[in-house]
């Protein structure tokens, strides 16, 4: 009673194909595959380019003056818990 049989899954698959159509499902599958491939490439590129840059680049100095005097931004100062 707790699990679905093969007939339940076939009926669900048939309803999904009838609602979306095979062309739309194929497009969604290729879009999902492209997104996963792009994510993996980005993770691979990000890990190889960030490692040397982080070790050789000097740390930026934080000053009390805001770099941008835009009125729509909020200046927030971090404080330690006491």
Swiss-Prot record:
Skewed-composition ranges (Polar residues): 62-71
GO terms under biological process: protein transport by the Tat complex
TM region(s), chain numbering: 1-21
The keyword Cell inner membrane is annotated on this UniProt entry: yes
InterPro entries to which the protein is assigned, alphabetical: TatA/B/E (IPR003369), TatA/E (IPR006312)
Cellular compartment(s): Cell inner membrane
Gene Ontology molecular function terms on file: protein transmembrane transporter activity
Residue ranges with Basic and acidic residues bias: 72-82
GO cellular component: TAT protein transport complex
Bias type Low complexity, positions: 51-60
Chief location: membrane
Region of interest (Disordered), ranges: 39-82
Annotated membrane topology: Single-pass membrane protein
The entry's keywords: Cell inner membrane, Cell membrane, Membrane, Protein transport, Translocation, Transmembrane, Transmembrane helix, Transport
Cited function: Part of the twin-arginine translocation (Tat) system that transports large folded proteins containing a characteristic twin-arginine motif in their signal peptide across membranes. TatA could form the protein-conducting channel of the Tat system.
Subunit structure, interactors included: The Tat system comprises two distinct complexes: a TatABC complex, containing multiple copies of TatA, TatB and TatC subunits, and a separate TatA complex, containing only TatA subunits. Substrates initially bind to the TatABC complex, which probably triggers association of the separate TatA complex to form the active translocon.
Record PANTHER family: SEC-INDEPENDENT PROTEIN TRANSLOCASE PROTEIN TATA (PTHR42982:SF1)
Family according to the record: Belongs to the TatA/E family.
Record protein name field: Sec-independent protein translocase protein TatA
Species of the source: Variovorax paradoxus (strain S110)
